[in-house]
């Protein structure tokens, strides 16, 4: 019954009264595929940019992503504070059988349809509605009109941003924040994720990508001082998920060996989580055949574990396959997502992946923050991706929409904790009582 009550509150726009902090500017950096141990205490010794940020601000032990530990679901979880089954962005690849439209990791035209994005209101849209100004750089979805609104400025993602692109975005964002053109600036950077996929999370290439980011961050702290923003700007860095090693030589599950692909209406994605829409009369047969396959679990929709906060999503398929860590599900070996390596052909093997059970250690991400509202040299306990939204709302001084995050997990990061916790006004207390009587 508690779940029904929460759904009711979300649907009808119930929100808490939020005594917000002073309205300061915010710079957000989303570093894709950044695993928590990339900035372990030992690693920080050779990362002066990150080390300075950690010494000046807050570092959590790790951030647990939402399930599935994929990019688009967590992009939206981070910016809404809601689980995937609430905001509806449940995968990098989705299909809507009612309209026969597909979302293919944001690259196809149909991915821009409101169908996929209007399930929840992300922070940048809330700020725009409040007449705040938002600048976004390479951020997936900033080019989309969501609930009839777009950000003030969107530098659209076209190709993987280079290290120079990232540095230029940081510099331009700081200029925009200093001049008053922006109240929030948000920057997405992907290279750590790309190198982790291609070469593996422990590879020299991934480590080089991290060092390049570290160099930009070292300059960023200098640029903040040069622009006189140190007393008026909070900076938050986080990742969407981690990365683990995969081995295509001997850890691939080929669906074509167990079922006829002609018995499927649709297949979406490959890797740790695969969505299947069987021809209706073949559903039971396919389910029972796949139940015997080792190193993966097949779930009918209602049997998906509640802890994933996934199965109530409207785009969730009748059958969901979840691989064991390090295993990769594909229709066949020929259909594996090879990448274009130095040969100029798509024949490069992937050596890292994510999307697995979100509680696995290798799926953990990062959260760092510094600025006038955050404590200095503070280590915080682990948080979850749903928690990030509340802390962002607080430091920009805006009331958060109803969400799944825990304020108690993040309030410890702030210098001032006495006036920042959510409270319920008297008239809302009466509403809660009525709802409890109705639902319980």
From Swiss-Prot:
Pfam families the record matches: Phosphodiest
Residues annotated for Zn(2+) 2 binding in this entry: 193, 197, 354
Q: Provide the residue positions that the database annotates as binding Zn(2+) 1.
A: 32, 71, 240-241
Tell me the GO molecular function terms.
Answer: glycerophosphocholine cholinephosphodiesterase activity; glycerophosphodiester phosphodiesterase activity; metal ion binding; phosphoric diester hydrolase activity
GO BP terms: choline metabolic process; lipid catabolic process; lipid metabolic process
Q: Where in the cell is it found?
A: Cell membrane
Q: Name one GO cellular component term.
A: side of membrane
Disulfide connectivity?
Answer: 142-154
Q: Which residues are glycosylated?
A: 100, 118, 341, 404
Q: Which domain of life is it from?
A: Eukaryota
**What membrane topology does this protein have?**
Lipid-anchor; GPI-anchor
Q: Where is the lipid attached (GPI-anchor amidated serine)?
A: 419
Q: What is its main location?
A: membrane
Function of the molecule: Choline-specific glycerophosphodiesterase that hydrolyzes glycerophosphocholine (GPC) and lysophosphatidylcholine (LPC) and contributes to supplying choline to the cells. Has a preference for LPC with short (12:0 and 14:0) or polyunsaturated (18:2 and 20:4) fatty acids. In vitro, hydrolyzes only choline-containing lysophospholipids, such as sphingosylphosphorylcholine (SPC), platelet-activating factor (PAF) and lysoPAF, but not other lysophospholipids.
Sequence similarity? Belongs to the nucleotide pyrophosphatase/phosphodiesterase family.
Question: In its UniProt entry, what is this protein called?
Answer: Glycerophosphocholine cholinephosphodiesterase ENPP6
Record organism: Rattus norvegicus (Rat)
């Amino acid at each position: 019954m508690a779940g029904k009550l929460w759904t009711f509150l979300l649907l009808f726009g119930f929100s808490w009264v939020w005594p917000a902090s002073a309205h300061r500017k915010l710079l957000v950096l989303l570093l894709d595929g950044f695993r928590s141990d990339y900035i372990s205490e030992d690693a920080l010794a050779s990362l002066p940019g990150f080390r300075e940020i950690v010494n000046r601000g807050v570092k959590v032990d790790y951030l647990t992503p939402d399930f599935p530990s994929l990019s688009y679901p967590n992009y939206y979880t981070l910016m809404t504070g809601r689980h995937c089954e609430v905001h509806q962005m449940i995968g990098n690849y989705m299909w809507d059988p009612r309209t026969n439209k597909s979302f293919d990791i944001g690259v196809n035209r149909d991915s821009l349809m409101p169908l996929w994005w209007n399930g929840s209101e992300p922070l940048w849209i809330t700020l725009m509605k409040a007449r705040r100004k938002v600048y976004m750089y390479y951020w997936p979805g900033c080019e989309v009109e969501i609930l009839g609104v777009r950000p003030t400025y969107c530098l659209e993602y076209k190709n993987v941003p280079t290290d120079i692109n990232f540095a230029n975005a940081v510099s331009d964002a700081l200029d925009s924040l200093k001049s008053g053109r922006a109240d929030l600036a948000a920057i997405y950077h992907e290279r750590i994720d790309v190198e982790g996929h291609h070469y593996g999370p422990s590879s020299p290439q991934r480590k080089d990508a991290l060092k390049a980011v570290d160099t930009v961050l070292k300059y960023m702290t200098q640029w903040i001082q040069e622009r006189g923003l140190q007393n008026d700007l909070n900076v938050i860095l986080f990742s969407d998920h981690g990365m683990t090693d995969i081995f295509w030589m001997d850890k691939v599950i080929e669906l074509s060996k167990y079922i006829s692909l002609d018995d499927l209406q649709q297949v979406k994605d490959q890797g740790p989580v695969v969505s299947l829409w069987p021809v209706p009369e073949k559903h039971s047969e396919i389910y029972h055949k796949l139940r015997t396959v080792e190193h993966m679990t097949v779930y009918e929709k209602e049997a998906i574990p509640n802890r994933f906060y996934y199965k109530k999503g409207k785009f969730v398929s009748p059958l969901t396959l979840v691989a064991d860590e390090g295993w990769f599900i594909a229709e066949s070996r020929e259909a594996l997502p090879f990448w274009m390596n130095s040969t100029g052909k798509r024949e490069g093997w992937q050596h890292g992946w994510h999307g697995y059970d979100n509680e696995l250690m290798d799926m953990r991400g990062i959260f760092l923050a510094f600025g006038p509202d955050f404590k200095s040299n503070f280590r915080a306990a682990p948080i979850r991706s749903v928690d990030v939204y509340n802390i962002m709302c607080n430091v920009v001084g805006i009331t958060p929409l109803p969400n799944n995050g825990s304020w108690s997990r993040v309030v410890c990061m702030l210098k001032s904790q006495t006036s920042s916790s959510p409270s319920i006004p008297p008239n809302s207390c009466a509403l809660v009582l009525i709802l409890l009587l109705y639902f319980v």
